């Protein structure tokens, strides 16, 4: 039930995607993973499984600490050094808890995946340079704003009650559909790759003992795009390091917890495969569209 799926080289992955039955195979793979996950949940519910109850207790304690967050969960990135923290969009009355979470979890990157127009979305930071807001004892100053075709990058300075400071990069994905237009895996992939490249470059500039902070991901579509973002980022990172990848294993990594609160379905899983297909084609130089898009978002 817990066996991992085979990691595929670029060529093997492309051969799989070229199979006329690939879409059916992908959806079948999704249902197999989900079935195994549910079987594991039943096993974990057995009376003798005290470890699971302890995990649940810790989870509930965490929820009590941040009572207004719809959900909180963390997932290892590919290299096990970085953490993804997935939450729902914070509400105006919840901004202090949001920044408390960011401070306590040592977040250095926030990824906001909006499905609504900018003026309708949550604004827990200022979009104007040199401006500052306060939220429950935390001060958030906007140092720099960089506008890209698909997203807006903002460098924030977060200060706590003791005047300790920490820089946080905030990335707001702005290419999401607003009028019931279909999501484009290619556009979202470009956004993921841009952030992944930024992290890779930053990591190379740091000292050997440096450890990255957590990445806080939130969206307002019921959290499915938070799951998609994490899966794609894991696959891209794995391919960079090993030349191979497994969408199935990345998906299992973020859904294997019994009490994970990410919402997703077979369509989201297929979306990930479509995006990674475009990524592999581009990395092999077989897609000029991919190369042009990457140049646009650098």
Positions of the model-derived regions?
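Cys-based phosphatases of the PTP/DUSP/CDC25 superfamily and their flanking regulatory architecture
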Residues: 1-298
């Amino acid at each position: 039930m817990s066996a991992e799926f085979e990691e595929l080289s670029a060529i093997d992955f492309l051969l799989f995607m070229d199979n006329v039955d690939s879409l059916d195979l992908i959806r079948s793979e999704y249902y197999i993973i989900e079935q195994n996950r549910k079987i594991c949940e039943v096993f974990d519910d057995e009376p003798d499984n005290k470890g699971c109850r302890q995990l649940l207790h810790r989870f509930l304690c965490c929820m009590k600490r941040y009572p207004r967050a719809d959900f909180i969960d963390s997932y290892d990135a590919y290299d096990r050094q970085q953490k993804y923290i997935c939450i729902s969009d914070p509400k105006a009355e919840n901004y202090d808890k949001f920044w408390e979470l960011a401070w306590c979890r040592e977040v250095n990157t926030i990824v906001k995946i909006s499905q609504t127009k900018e003026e309708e979305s949550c604004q827990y930071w200022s979009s104007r340079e040199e401006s500052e807001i306060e939220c429950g004892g935390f001060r958030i100053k906007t140092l720099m704003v960089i506008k890209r075709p698909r997203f807006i990058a903002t460098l924030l300075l977060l200060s706590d009650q003791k005047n300790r400071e920490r820089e946080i990069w905030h990335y707001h994905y702005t290419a999401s559909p607003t009028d019931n237009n279909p999501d484009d895996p290619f556009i979202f992939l470009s956004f993921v790759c841009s952030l992944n490249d930024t992290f890779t470059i930053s990591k190379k500039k740091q000292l050997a003992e440096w450890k990255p902070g957590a990445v806080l991901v939130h969206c307002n579509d019921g959290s499915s795009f938070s799951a998609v973002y994490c899966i794609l980022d894991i696959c891209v990172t794995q391919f960079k390091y090993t030349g191979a990848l497994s969408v199935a294993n990345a998906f299992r990594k973020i859904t294997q917890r019994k009490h994970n609160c990410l919402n997703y379905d077979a369509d989201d899983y297929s979306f990930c495969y479509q995006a990674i297909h475009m990524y592999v084609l581009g990395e092999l130089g077989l897609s000029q569209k991919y190369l042009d898009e990457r140049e646009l978002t650098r």
